[in-house]
C-alpha cells in the first residue's frame, strides 16, 4: 500500500488539503525558498488554485475553481521580461544614434556610452590600461553585502536585501537611458572636457559614497580605494530605484537629507572628476539638442568662411578694413546679447568662444536667432529650398532673407578681385567719358535745323490769323451739314425713319377703369372651354408648323 502511494506520488503531484496542519509549515518553507531567489519566484507561474478533495482510498478528483483560468490570462511574471526587452531595445537604438554622430572613444571619454560588452561582474580598470583608474560598478556579491549592512535592524532578513539589490540593478538599467539621452556637447566644450575622464555610472558613485561614509574602516578589494581620493558626493538616485530607497538604512536617509535635494539639479548635469585629480570641473548644464546642433553648424560654417574673410581683408583698402571691423564688432555685440538671453544661471567660457568665432557667419546667425520661430516649420533643408523657390515662405522670413542678402552683397573691391567688375584707372575712365561726349555731340550736330524741317513740311509755321481761319472753316462745314439734315416727315416719306407701329397693326382698345370689375375674370367653366376649343382650331388650321418642331407647340386641353 505504501509502495503504491509512493509510485503515485512520483507520477502525480498531490496537493494537500488546507485542513491538514502540515500544510502551513510546508507553505512557509516554500515561501522562504522563494524569498532566497526572487527571480525564480517571478518566473514560475502561480500554482493552480484547485482544491483537491480526496476520499479514503480513491485518487483525488479535480474541481476547477473560479480562479483557475486567472493564470492563463493574468501573467505578471512575464511583465518584467517585456520591460527588460524594451529597455534593451531603447538603449541599443540610442547608442547607435550617438555612435553615428561621434567616435566611440570620444563617447567613452565623455561617459555617454556604456560598454555593452561588460559582463555581470564589472571589475575596476587596472592602472596599466589607462593613466587614470575609472570607477566601475561593484559586483553582485559586494552589492548584496552593502545592502545587507545598510538594511534596517528590524527588517525581515534576506528577502528585503535581495529585493533592494534587484531594484538597484533595475535602476542602473533605467539610468543608462538617462545618460544616453544627454545630447553630445559642442566641439568647443569637447576641447576643455577631453582631458577629464568622468566616471561611467552614477549609481556606482552613490554606492561607493554611501559605503565610504557608512563603514570607513572596511577595505574593499579595489584599486580605487588604495589611492588618496577625496570623498565623492553621492548623486541622487534615479526614479526607478524608489523601491530601494524605502529599505535603505536610517543613516543613508539622514545623509541624503534636504542638502542633497537642493544640490540635485546641479549634480545631475555635473561631470564627476576621477579620483586623484587635483581640481574639480566646472558645473555645466546640459544644453538642449537644438542649441547644440546650432553651435555645431556655426562652428563648421566659420571654418569654411574664415579663409575667404582673411583673403578679402588683406586685399581690401584700409577704409574697407575699418568698415569690416566696425560691422564685425557690432555683430559681435549683438551676438553677446543673444547669448546672454539664451544662457542659463552660469554659461561656460566655451560657449562664449564658440559664439565669438561664429559672429563672422552672418547668414547662419540671422537664420538661427531672429528667424527661429518662423523656421520651425522648415527644419528640413529640402523643404526650405522648395519654399524659397516657390515663394511660400512667411513674409517675415522673406524680409529677413532679403535683408541678409543685401547686407552680404559684395563690395566693388571684391567684384574687381573676382574679375566680375573690370579694374580701371582714372585715366581710362576719363578717356571713356570723352569718347561718350564725342558720340553725343556728333548725334546732336547731325540733327536737322528748324528751316530744314519747315522746308520738308515737318514743322509748320503758325500764326494767330491762320489758326482762326482754320477754325472758321470747320464751323461752317458743321453748320452746313446740320442745315442740310432732312426733317422727320421727309425721312418717313423716304421710309428711312420707321416706327414699330409701321410693322405691327395696332388695335385700338377701349379705355376702361382699372379699379372697376374686370368682365373676363367672371368667366364660367363653359366659357373657358369654348375659348380653348376656338384656340385649338385656329392653331390646327391657320398656323402652319413644321413637322420637326410640332412637338414644341402647345395644345390646350379642351
UniProtKB/Swiss-Prot annotation:
Residues modified to Phosphoserine: 229
Modified residues (Phosphothreonine): 69, 235
SMART domains for this protein: RPEL
One GO MF term: protein phosphatase inhibitor activity
Start-end of Polar residues biased regions: 1-11, 144-169
Sections of the chain in a coiled coil: 449-485
Region (Disordered): 1-69, 81-288, 300-366
Positions of RPEL repeats: 92-117, 400-425, 438-463, 476-501
Record Gene3D superfamilies: 6.10.140.1750, 6.10.140.2130
Compartments where located: Nucleus matrix
Pfam families (alphabetical): RPEL (PF02755)
Alphabetized InterPro entries for the sequence: RPEL_repeat (IPR004018)
Quaternary state and interactors: Binds PPP1CA and actin; thus inhibiting the protein phosphatase 1 (PP1) activity.
Protein family per UniProt: Belongs to the phosphatase and actin regulator family.
Name by which UniProt lists this protein: Phosphatase and actin regulator 3
Organism of origin: Mus musculus (Mouse)
Gene name tied to this protein: Phactr3
